[in-house]
């Protein structure tokens, strides 16, 4: 371990079902090991790429034993391991090996240069908030889940609109007929919420955003509320209504079920390279400051 590093054990997590990911992961592990750090692999990653040289740990073991986890994958990989490691406050470093990469911000081509710098202490730390959700049926909790991006109540593709009764901190907000409702963290504001015309929330903003999905009334607009609010969504009518968490787990709902959503007591520490800018990420990923060429306009 480098003398000025606060880390000793580094866990590596890879994107599942990704051909060719084994070689860059093992090369990165070898590089980090040569710097004096202990290496461990997330168990599913180790099994998938056939690694036996280093210990294979379940997420709970990573939380207990590793000082930092490096994720090589897309945003979905980061969301999944982030939820599992949240109770342990294990910092995450994200290397983009997916498509968009809002939260895996280190370019794949730069990882061999940037990761050693970060492990030696050259990084910027940021805490990201989570949501916790509870589904109530007949007065009893039937399901609990964490969400990094969002909790989404929506209808199936072949059913009509759902009617949802929405309350905040016990105060009635509205009955909404729509295809569903998104409750998103600032991190999730650039995910499904953004494609449903929701606002972008800076990750350090202490807020949640409620975004209707294709509402019947055009006056049903997104609203930003304090992140210490409790949001309750009751199913008034509709068939085949579901709730999903980060689009990675879901459960079917029945009439009169209530979904309670609030900020989790857990946060997820993100580590970024020095000089990281959220605005630069938005500019790059959303192609701000890019204008169509006149050569591409047939009417010009």
From Swiss-Prot:
Identify the coding gene: nadK
Where does it reside? Cytoplasm
Instruction: Please give the Pfam families that the UniProt record associates with this protein.
Output: NAD_kinase, NAD_kinase_C
Question: Per its Swiss-Prot or TrEMBL entry, what cofactor is needed?
Answer: a divalent metal cation
Instruction: Name the family.
Output: Belongs to the NAD kinase family.
InterPro entries associated with the record: ATP-NAD_kinase_N (IPR017438), ATP-NAD_kinase_PpnK-typ_C (IPR017437), NAD/diacylglycerol_kinase_sf (IPR016064), NADK (IPR002504)
Matching entries from Gene3D superfamilies are given as: Probable inorganic polyphosphate/atp-NAD kinase, domain 1 (3.40.50.10330), Probable inorganic polyphosphate/atp-NAD kinase, domain 2 (2.60.200.30)
| Function (record text) | Involved in the regulation of the intracellular balance of NAD and NADP, and is a key enzyme in the biosynthesis of NADP. Catalyzes specifically the phosphorylation on 2'-hydroxyl of the adenosine moiety of NAD to yield NADP.
Q: Recite the lineage of the species.
A: Bacteria, Pseudomonadati, Pseudomonadota, Betaproteobacteria, Burkholderiales
Question: Which HAMAP family does the record cross-reference, listed alphabetically?
Answer: NAD_kinase
Q: Name one GO biological process term.
A: NAD metabolic process
The EC number(s) this enzyme carries:
2.7.1.23
Annotated catalysed reactions? NAD(+) + ATP = ADP + NADP(+) + H(+)
**Major place of residence:** cytoplasm
The positions flagged as active site in the entry are: 75
The residues that cross the membrane are none
- A GO molecular-function descriptor: NAD+ kinase activity
Task: Give the CC-aspect GO terms.
Answer: cytoplasm
What is the name listed in the Swiss-Prot or TrEMBL entry for this protein?
Answer: NAD kinase
């Amino acid at each position: 371990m480098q003398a000025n590093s606060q880390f000793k054990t580094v866990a590596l997590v890879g994107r599942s079902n990704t051909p060719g990911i084994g070689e860059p992961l093992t090369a990165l592990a070898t590089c980090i090991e040569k710097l004096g750090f202990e290496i461990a692999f997330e168990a599913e990653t180790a099994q998938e790429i056939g690694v036996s040289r280093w210990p294979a740990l379940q997420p709970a073991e990573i939380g207990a034993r590793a000082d930092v986890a490096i994720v090589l994958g897309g945003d979905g990989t980061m969301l999944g391991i982030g939820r599992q490691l949240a109770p342990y406050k294990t910092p995450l470093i994200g290397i983009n090996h997916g498509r968009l990469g809002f939260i895996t911000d280190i370019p794949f081509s730069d990882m061999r240069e940037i990761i050693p710098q970060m492990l030696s202490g050259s990084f910027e730390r940021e805490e990201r908030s989570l949501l916790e959700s509870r589904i109530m049926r007949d007065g009893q909790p039937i399901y609990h889940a964490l969400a990094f991006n969002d909790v989404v109540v929506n209808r199936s593709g072949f059913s009509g609109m759902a009617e949802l009764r929405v309350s905040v901190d016990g105060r009635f907000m509205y009955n909404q007929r729509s295809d569903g409702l998104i409750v998103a963290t600032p991190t999730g504001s650039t995910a499904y919420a953004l494609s449903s015309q929701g606002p972008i929330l800076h990750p350090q903003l202490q807020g949640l955003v409620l975004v209707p999905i294709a509402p019947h009334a055009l006056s049903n607009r997104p609203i930003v509320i304090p992140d210490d609010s409790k949001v309750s969504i009751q199913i008034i009518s509709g068939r085949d209504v579901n709730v999903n968490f980060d689009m990675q787990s879901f459960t079917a709902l029945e009439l009169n079920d209530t979904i309670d959503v609030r900020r989790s007591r857990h946060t997820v520490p993100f580590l970024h390279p020095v000089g990281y800018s959220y605005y630069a990420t938005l500019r790059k990923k959303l192609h701000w400051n890019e204008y169509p060429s006149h050569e591409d306009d047939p009417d010009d």
